[in-house]
């Protein structure tokens, strides 16, 4: 076992012809009165109706990280402790800082510092998928759209220019934007463009001289990061991570100031490799589920950049990730363990 920062990498070396990577992030989003996690006995009022359906006599694991993704981490730890006769060599990766800006991502740091630690023929990330397969992922970028004004006393507003009022046009463009559903290699990815934060003003009696609308764009894997950025701010705006504010030369936010905050590429489904096909076949036989598109960003994109085919497969519903009542039925953990155990033996 090797460690880089808060990321642990453990590998078997039995001389198998192929190597499979099992990866899971250790961090969660902030708690919302849902920590520490705990088991809920059948009938507990905290068990959601949609989770209880079909699992009436089952315990549920409740609390922050239950689905995203401590449940899957637990399954991988179980496999690491018990699976001694796998037909592939295995690398387990448990990493930090997945839920924050890409520059802090523990997997990214390991890849940059020790690329030989993260080598393999196929990777599975335990993001919540209801134990089905979700292929690829949307890309993501976050940026501030900025308006500028002139500060003045609010009793003499005509002496200034209100940057918050000017931001109304940013919101108008967001409201007018039509998010698209895009098919890539047989899977349908839903794009999204949303304001997630807004800030402006320095005092309650001061006309604001700046307003920032923080925007998150989730884009399908039919386009590169550069192509997605061009759709938002133009191809030659010059806005890059860490280089300050630039004016959008085209795209949705043409004419506004832009400061890039975070960006990560998308990944195509990655289901064409023989290892992926054999896993798809097993999951379909056991659950009746065909692969779906992963709508959020995950580190399958990072494996894709390394030339390693990767899919998402984990316990719990992706619809409950980050929710205050995050939870999963106990059988999801058993199903994930059984699927991976049988596929790896």
Describe every region a protein language model picked out.
Residues 4-6, 24-26, 96-97, 126-129, ...:
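Fold-independent oxyanion-binding glycine-rich loops
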